[in-house]
Structure formats: C-alpha cells, structure tokens
C-alpha cells in the first residue's frame, strides 16, 4: 500500500493573476502553507506535469492566446518554477496533458498537438496538428472571439489513457467524448471515435481513465453526473452507469460540475460541482468502486458541501499516495472568495477540512484555479 511522505510540494495556478504558487503540505502537522510566489506569464487555469516530473505545462488566460512550459526547479527546500517557453495558440486553451513527445491542448473549437524536446520544453513552433471539433454553421463562429465562450461550449479537457495509446477529449458543446489514438513514437494523433453522452443535456467536461485502461469516467457539467464508460473494442466507449454529484432534491440548473478524479488505490471516484451563483454552495461527492472500476453503488458513499459556490473553481486534485492513516488527501480551490483547502477523506468517516489558506488579499482578489501535486 502506498503511504504518503511527510510533506508534499504543490503548485497552484490562478484564473487571472500572473502568479504560480509553491505550497507545501505537511502531512503529520496537517498544515498547508505558501512557500513561494513564482512569476508567471499570466493566469494559469490548468497545469500539467511532464511524465518525468521536470516540466510544468500551463494554459494561459489572456491575449494573445498562448501556452507555456516551465522548468520545475528542485534541490532546495521546496520546488520553484522557471519559464522555459511560450508558444502561440489559435484559441485560448482550457486544459493540457503531456507525454514525452508532445503536449495536447483542448481549446474549445479544436484539439491541438504541440511537440516537446528531449527535456520536455515546448518547441518554438505552432501546433503540428489541429482537429476541428465544430460542425456545420458552428465553423463560421470559430474566430478569435471564441475564448472563454468556446471553452464553455466546446472541447474542454484532454487526458491520456494509462498506457498512453489513447487521448480522451470531453466536449461540452458536442455532448460527447472524442477518442484519439496516439502514436507513441511521434506523439501524433489519429481520430478514432465520437462517443455521445447518455443524456441530451449532459455536457461532458472532463474524462478521466481508470488505471486498468478499460473504464473512463465522464464528468457531465450540465447534469452533474459522473458516468462510467467501458472501452469496448479499442475504438469506442459504452455507457455503464452513473451517479449524481448533487442530492436528489437539488435543482440541477443551479450547478455546473467541475472535476472527476480517483483515489490513489482507484477504489473511490470523486466528483465536484460548483454553484452557478454565489450563495449556492457546491459539492464534492465520493462513490466506492469495485476492483474492475465499476460503481459498487451509484448512490453516493459520502457528500461534502463546500463553503461557497466555488466560483469558477471547486476543483479537486488528489494526492498521489494515501496518508498515514489510510486517508485520501486532496486540494479544493475556491475562486469566489480566493482560498484553497486540504480535504481528507475516508470511506468510513467521509470528508473533513484539514487546513485552509486565504490566497486573496485586501489589495488584490486572486482566484485560485487548479493545483498539481509534486
């Protein structure tokens, strides 16, 4: 059983502020603190760490659209970041992931492939592949104004299968999850299938694979469901079952789901949702899983009501190892007020807030977005 170290470095981006935060979480003291505020090229709403752990990739919310790679500098008391390269993007990206050949970007109207060098740095060149996700008259709207609106109504995420041979792209606007085959020698993609969501109003936002490679969890932004799909023939996804993040009595139209992630042992799946307006708290929900990745029950094992709506965030990122008492640690970011929490979860006791840090100041409203654990 994997056991957490005594402390972790965590990197955190924001939606609008040019800062990258280095945080440390002391597992035994159960304490989270800011160690460094690194200079950033803009607001980084999504972060990804290269497979070797030496490069940070980031989306940039700003004009002109671009993507960024940073060197992760280690050797001191805590990790810091150093800019390695900016590259232009046709549209503002919402999500990136990487292997040792390429970085993949979901940016609303399309999915892009950017190549990286042997050190993981983005090459100083445009995307080598772009897959248009728009259909019919939608293509006429695909111009420079499709920034945040494009992300809200288009391709929103990109994640690789555990063996690195497939890329899953959740597309809110097309109500589907696209599958691409990955050439591991070159990093290039080939479109494989378009997998329509179960409900006409689902709006897939993120698609996260189980370590066994056969199950993919699709987070539905509009309906607040976490759905399990099975990879059927290496080309298509088949719906199995789903659980709702919010309680039955809540109005789905007042929420927009944000994130889906697994516990370190892949025996629990977590989903989070935000309130559409201030005064509507969001939820983080957990379901126990069978060893094959299917739901033990689609009824929630535990729910946690968040302190605020979460703003644009209420994003969870799970610690890669269990805590000393078998607990699952995760970060929860809030952009409404501007704080980050560490949550601990066990299937027996549910969720608890371990620590909280206010990031916003009286002089500046800072909007925490997402984190990565190092």
UniProtKB/Swiss-Prot annotation:
It comes from Cutaneotrichosporon cutaneum. GO terms for molecular function: 6-phosphogluconolactonase activity; muconate cycloisomerase activity. Homotetramer. Gene3D superfamilies: YVTN repeat-like/Quinoprotein amine dehydrogenase (2.130.10.10). Its EC number is 5.5.1.1. GO terms for biological process: beta-ketoadipate pathway. InterPro entries: Cycloisomerase_2, Lactonase_7-beta_prop, WD40/YVTN_repeat-like_dom_sf. It catalyses: (S)-muconolactone = cis,cis-muconate + H(+). Pathway: Aromatic compound metabolism; beta-ketoadipate pathway; 5-oxo-4,5-dihydro-2-furylacetate from catechol: step 2/3. It holds the Pfam family Lactonase. Catalyzes a syn cycloisomerization. Belongs to the cycloisomerase 2 family. Keywords: Isomerase. This is Muconate cycloisomerase 1.
């Amino acid at each position: 059983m994997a056991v957490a170290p005594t402390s972790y470095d965590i990197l955190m981006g924001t939606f609008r502020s040019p800062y990258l935060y280095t945080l440390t979480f002391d597992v035994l003291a159960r304490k989270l603190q800011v160690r460094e505020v690194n200079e950033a090229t803009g607001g980084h709403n999504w972060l990804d760490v290269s497979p070797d752990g030496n490069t940070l990739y980031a989306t940039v919310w700003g004009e002109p659209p671009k993507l960024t790679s940073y060197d992760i500098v280690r050797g001191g008391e805590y990790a810091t970041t150093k800019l390695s390269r900016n590259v232009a993007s046709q549209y503002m990206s919402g999500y990136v992931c990487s292997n040792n050949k390429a970085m993949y970007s979901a940016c609303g109207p399309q999915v892009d492939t950017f190549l990286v060098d042997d050190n993981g740095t983005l090459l100083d060149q445009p995307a080598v592949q772009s897959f248009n996700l728009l259909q019919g008259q939608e293509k006429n709207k695909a111009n420079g104004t499709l920034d945040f609106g494009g992300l809200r109504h288009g391709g929103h995420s990109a994640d690789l299968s555990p063996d690195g041979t497939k890329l899953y792209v959740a597309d809110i606007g097309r109500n589907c999850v696209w599958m691409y085959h990955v050439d591991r020698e070159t990093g290039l993609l080939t479109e494989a299938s378009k997998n329509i969501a179960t409900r006409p109003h689902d709006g897939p936002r993120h698609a996260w694979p189980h370590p066994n490679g056969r199950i993919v969890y699709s987070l539905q932004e509009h309906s607040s469901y976490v759905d399990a799909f099975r990879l059927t023939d290496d080309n298509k996804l088949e719906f199995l079952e789903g659980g709702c993040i919010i309680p039955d009595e809540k109005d789905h139209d007042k929420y927009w789901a944000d994130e889906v992630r697994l516990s370190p042992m892949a025996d629990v799946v977590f989903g989070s949702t935000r309130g559409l307006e201030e005064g509507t708290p969001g939820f983080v929900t957990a379901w126990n899983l069978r060893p094959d990745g299917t739901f033990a029950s689609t009824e929630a094992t535990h729910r946690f009501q968040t302190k605020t709506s979460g703003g644009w965030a209420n994003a969870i990122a799970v610690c890669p190892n269990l805590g000393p008492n078998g607990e699952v640690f995760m970060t929860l970011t809030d952009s409404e007020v501007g704080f980050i929490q560490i949550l601990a979860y066990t299937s027996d006791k549910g969720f608890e807030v371990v620590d909280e840090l206010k990031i916003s100041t009286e002089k500046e409203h800072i909007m925490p977005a997402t984190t990565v654990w190092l």
